[in-house]
Amino acid sequence: MFESFKQFLVDDLRINPDDITMEAELTQDLGINSLELADLVYTCEEKFNVEIDDDVLHTFKTVGDVVRFLESNS
């Protein structure tokens, strides 16, 4: 799941693959802004067949947070 999510970050958001680790913070380390976060949520919902509500979205601080959610819910 990590590799699939990492590839999305590289392909869609143009993030340097070397910067993407499980511990990398979405906003601080990867520079993802609110519009990109909305795109991230939409794409994850479509690609991984999950629903991410606002309450869950606010818990996503790191790449690992998103990956663990996707692993548990897809």
Q: What positions do the PLM features span?
A:
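Two-component histidine kinase catalytic core, primarily the HATPase_c
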Residues: E36
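Phosphopantetheine carrier-protein modules
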Residues: D12-G31, F48-T59
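Thiotemplate assembly-line natural product biosynthesis machinery
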Residues: M1-D18, E71-N73
